[in-house]
Amino acid sequence: MASTLKLPVGIENFEEIRKLGFYYIDKTRLIEQLLQGWGKVTLFTRPRRFGKTLNMSMLRSFFEKGTDKALFEGLYISGNKELCDEHMGKYPVIFLSFKGVDGLDFTTARRMLCAILKDELDRHYYLKNSDVLTDEDRTLFTKMLHGQDDNIEDSIRMLSKLLYKHYGQKVVILIDEYDVPLDKAFQNGYYKEMVSIIRGLFGQALKTNEFLQFAVLTGCLRVSKESIFTGLNNFEINSIVDIDHDEQFGFTDDEVMKLLLDYDRSERYPDAKEWYDGYHFGNADIYCPWDVINFAKKLVSDQSARPSAFWINSSGNDMVKRFVDKADQTTRDEIEKLVAGGFVEKQLRLDLTYDEIDNTIDNLWSVLFTTGYLTKIGEVKVPDSESYAYKLVIPNKEVREVFILQIQEWFKAVVANDDDTMKLLSKAILDKDEKQITRQLNIVMSRMISILDTKAPDAMKENFYHGLLLGLLRGSNPDWLIKSNRESGDGFSDILIEPEDPDAGIVIEVKYAKEMKELDAACEAAMAQIKNKRYDEALRDEGRCDILAYGIAFCRKRCRVAGEKL
């Protein structure tokens, strides 16, 4: 019988999921791992939409005083009774999410940060009337509550001090999406000012805070320690290359199969794997949870639903765009290899500052890896060095789609800015100059990044070149009427062109050749098909009698052109 539990699309509150009857994949082992592998301050870096916020909400529900212990009944952590007795509901908790800190200028972003801090102060409003606190403490809290204390950098530490005094227990600090303010600041030109505030906040709250039991932070990027974590001792960073906690963010293969079985959709497991699997965190093979939950929800209402790019569409993909735009010829060749299903070997930096990201193409490789657009399938030792390089691949079909989209957008811009080549191409087509057509097409293709999957069937490869040529023709002369796959004669012609001259018409048939030596034969086959299928008939029906026919064959980044007047 299929599960009747609701699927929690977009719900990141652990208590809400548990109380309102949503499906939950148990990640409570993270609690045990954190407490057994003790660290004063732990930073988890994972790509966006990989369950960071839900896990932080789960930690808050477990540790915070007054928690509802029934939330954890039947979950992994409940089996460790000794740990639960010692730690569940034992700590005051400060929980902050910096996800909403945005702004086109520093003043706006600072105001948003203050609002988030105030929301957490409001959550602890009871401190205003605490009998344990002194009058001075309560006055300070009231000032902080009403935004009268401008010392924002000390606000988290001061709140933890007041909580410690009230409860007589050190505080757990949870900071989700710690790096979002830095990302937005870098994009909008106030990075140094934001770094100063975040460094001050963390320095006071995490470094010199005698009232801290432990802290957990999450984010996408591991910002260099020297940037905002200066001087922090006992500071542990857990990233996508680490084995510890490698199954606690994202879904494992077994978890995805069980979810699909629970909803009677196990036959769609291959689709889920092809589109959303492929991430390698530590030693674990991981699926993107945002994708899996969204796909499963679609399947519940429509068993034949096709996979969609849920993760990619949940925010912009500027990093891939910047990468493609910045790529030199060597990098473009490497991108082609990735899109074709291959791997590249790269030494990466996992601790960048945001203002270093665009400094080199190597830094962009690193960011694509840490943000989930690339994943590792192994490591290789760098010759004459003690260092290792990662073997990087595009993780799955969904991410491959975003690379293809950005490559197509980049190529359109390249073509649009090359008026000379486009004019020469259109003139050569009208003049039946096969050599010049070949030359101009080869020039354009030498600049492009191929998005061909080497494992794709020949028909798909032919469609790729068809689409490429169609785009070039539309860019070469905006006054031409160009039709694709239109019925003509005894079939469907690849491309028909109606130039400004009312008597002129052009027929083009596209072929794919596996090897360079097959280009001439492919051109001849294209020309024979045009004649045998009478693809010129639709143009003649329009009164166009001066017809040129072209057979154009492609192999990798080269082409051959045969032409004839019909």
PLM-predicted stretches and their roles:
Residues 1-64, 68-80:
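Walker A/P-loop-proximal flanking segment of P-loop NTPase domains
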Residues 9-18, 101-104, 108-153, 181-186:
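Conserved P-loop NTPase mechanochemical-coupling segment
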Residues 10, 61-126:
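P-loop NTPase motor core
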Residues 121, 155-166, 193-213, 535-538:
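Substrate-engagement module of ASCE P-loop NTPases
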Residues 180, 190-232:
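Sensor-1/coupling segment of RecA-like P-loop NTPase cores
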Residues 225-232, 238-297:
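Amphipathic alpha-helical segments of the small helical/lid subdomains adjacent to P-loop NTPase cores
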Residues 235, 287-534, 559-566:
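Extended alpha-helical interface modules used as scaffolds for assembling large macromolecular complexes
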Residues 538, 542-566:
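Domain-level recognition of nuclease-like catalytic cores that cleave nucleotide substrates
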